[in-house]
Each structure stands twice: as structure tokens, then as C-alpha cells.
Amino acid sequence: MKIGIVCYPTFGGSGVVATELGKALAKEGHQVHFITYSQPQRLDFLNENLFYHEVNIPTYPLFQYPPYESALSSEMVHVAQYAGLDLLHVHYAIPHASSAYLAKQILASQGIRVPVITTLHGT
């Protein structure tokens, strides 16, 4: 399978879980595409089954906060089209699941069906 994984790239629990899951899936022969704003800390190598796609977050002087959700959705759409993803697995509801929902709707309007799995993390 070609799997997109969206996670926070930090050393925190969800980032560790998502990265280790992706590495294990790649070891089993799946193609895994990490989509996030920085290369995950525990993703210390890339190979023929492991890819990293950086979310480019534009800045606008009129916005107090950068539009990360829009940029993330856009990158998910791009990777799904480019890599032919079979599945998106997002970790965390906000902003990842909401961005995945938007990306799924954009892809559906183009006749592309990509199922989304959300893993909720929290303390």
C-alpha cells in the first residue's frame, strides 16, 4: 500500500508512535509518505519506501497566525495525487483530521477516493 502519515514531527508520544509505525510499515514493504512541517525527529533515514514531504507554511502580514490547516490540506492533496496514496493516516484531531477531511473532499471532487484513518492522542 501507499500510505500517507500526518503527524507532529516532535519527540512527543504521538510523533514517536506515528514515526515508528511508518518505519515498521515501510519495513514490511509498504510505501510510507510522512506529511508534516518538519522531518520527524525519529525518522533518521529515508529509503525506497520512506518519504518526507514538507508542508510549506506561507505567511501573510494580515494574519496573526499562519494558515497551517490550509497548507497541510493542500500538501495532502498534492502527495495523494503525486504518489497515488491508498490511505491517509492522521494523528491528532485538530489540525490533522480536519485538514484530512478537507483534503478528502478536494480529492473526491476530482474523482480520487482516499480513505482517512484518524488516531486520537491525548493526555
Can you describe what each PLM-predicted range is?
Residues 1-4:
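Extreme N-terminal starter segment of soluble prokaryotic enzymes
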Residues 7-11, 23-67:
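N-terminal strand-loop element at the rim of the active site
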Residues 16, 20:
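A conserved mid-protein helix/loop that constitutes part of the nucleotide-sugar donor-binding site
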Residues 66-75:
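Glycine-rich, highly charged phosphate/nucleotide-binding loops
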Residues 76-96:
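Short N-terminal targeting/anchoring amphipathic segment
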Residues 106-113:
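Short helix-capping segments at alpha-helix termini
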Residues 114-123:
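A short, histidine- and acid-enriched strand-loop-helix "catalytic/donor-clamping" loop
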